[in-house]
């Protein structure tokens, strides 16, 4: 085990004093579960500094990796775990904040569509899902982290950067800002989905003008 990826929703990265006990199987919250896993790993490898994990937090909150680390520290203190373990947890492990940007609307429910995809793929996949073409995963991490992750070799759009903040600012101001800017007028004009809005010259022209004159100049 080298990498832990979490996506427990915005509510998953939370600490509540007393909600999980050290000997509880399993602890209630994800941060408590992770703290216990890290403690067992620390014990099994006798605190070896090279046995830490890379922890990629994908929850949609600011500084998700740092917030997860704070929660783990709170549980370690609640459980009176020794200072040597807490030091190992914070220094041998890498808690990475990340930004994930891809819309995944859900599994395919139409049997005919599923059958056509299975025939095209040549196999049956019970977990087949649908996602938009665009996707990006920005991981805030130290030098050398990219070498541990297989994404670059796979050719997917994943970046390891020293600071995820400017990438989040770009997403919020361009993508989210564009949607917020045209959605009210588009809805009143009878449009229900973004695709149809982008096929309308007036709405698309308004959005482009708004982005170039109001959004992009502030990034």
Label each PLM-derived region with a short phrase.
Residues 1-216:
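Substrate/ligand-engaging "lid" and interaction regions
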């Amino acid at each position: 085990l080298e990498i832990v990826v979490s996506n427990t929703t915005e509510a998953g990265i939370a600490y509540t004093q007393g909600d999980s006990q050290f000997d509880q199987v399993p602890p209630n919250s994800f941060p408590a579960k992770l703290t216990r896993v890290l403690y067992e790993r620390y014990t099994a490898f006798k605190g070896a500094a090279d046995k830490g994990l890379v922890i990629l937090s994908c929850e949609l909150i600011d500084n998700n990796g740092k917030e997860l680390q704070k929660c783990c520290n709170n549980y370690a203190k609640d459980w009176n775990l020794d200072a040597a373990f807490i030091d190992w947890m914070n220094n041998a492990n890498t808690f990475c904040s990340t930004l994930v940007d891809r819309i995944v609307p859900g599994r395919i429910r139409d049997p005919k569509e599923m059958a056509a995809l299975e025939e095209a793929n040549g196999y049956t996949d019970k977990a087949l899902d649908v996602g938009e073409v665009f996707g990006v995963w920005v991981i805030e991490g130290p030098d050398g982290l990219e070498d541990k992750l297989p994404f670059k070799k796979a050719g997917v759009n994943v970046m390891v950067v020293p600071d995820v903040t400017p990438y989040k600012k770009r997403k919020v101001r361009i993508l989210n800002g564009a949607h917020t800017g045209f959605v009210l007028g588009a809805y009143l004009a009878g449009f229900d989905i973004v695709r149809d809005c982008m096929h309308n010259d007036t709405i698309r022209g308004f959005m482009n003008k708004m982005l170039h004159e109001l959004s992009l100049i502030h990034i």
